[in-house]
């Protein structure tokens, strides 16, 4: 089995990169997020690899981090999730955001992935909540804040700040995480506009 490939970027396809390793071109399928962050053609690159072997083919899946690869494996333990859907989830949520979405039950963020409807998103959140890998710890403050926002129990400035970031196009889980971080710096009594400004700064990092 292949665990890692290190070579030079040869070319890109719609959902794959061809990595030239000592003159051999390997077709490696990746999430859209990973492809966007790959070096340019002709530049060196390294990917962690998951190898899938079937009777009629061998397919390689590539990841920029071991965390992304582990989530790819974990997602496929849920019924109805294959390699394509798992890559779709990782295309819209990086590992840290996915861990937060699972921990907080944020089905809306998960269902943004292609091929993931509300039912499958709910199943993913429910079945993986207790299986989330130890390498993806979630801030307890984020879980508490997300729950308060969901139940309508969050202070109004906090709820308004999260809503504002969501309206700007950020997934609920990322908006909540940014505002949770903003609260730590600004304090519990901060106004919504202050939280929004600090939250946007967090998201820009």
Swiss-Prot record:
Gene Ontology biological process terms in this record: DNA recombination; DNA repair
Keywords: Cytoplasm, DNA damage, DNA recombination, DNA repair, DNA-binding
Compartment annotation: Cytoplasm
One Pfam family this sequence matches: RuvA_N
GO cellular component: cytoplasm; Holliday junction helicase complex; Holliday junction resolvase complex
Subunit structure, as described in the record: Homotetramer. Forms an RuvA(8)-RuvB(12)-Holliday junction (HJ) complex. HJ DNA is sandwiched between 2 RuvA tetramers; dsDNA enters through RuvA and exits via RuvB. An RuvB hexamer assembles on each DNA strand where it exits the tetramer. Each RuvB hexamer is contacted by two RuvA subunits (via domain III) on 2 adjacent RuvB subunits; this complex drives branch migration. In the full resolvosome a probable DNA-RuvA(4)-RuvB(12)-RuvC(2) complex forms which resolves the HJ.
Domain-related comment: Has three domains with a flexible linker between the domains II and III and assumes an 'L' shape. Domain III is highly mobile and contacts RuvB.
The protein, known as: Holliday junction branch migration complex subunit RuvA
Provenance organism: Methylobacterium radiotolerans (strain ATCC 27329 / DSM 1819 / JCM 2831 / NBRC 15690 / NCIMB 10815 / 0-1)
Gene transcribed to yield this protein: ruvA
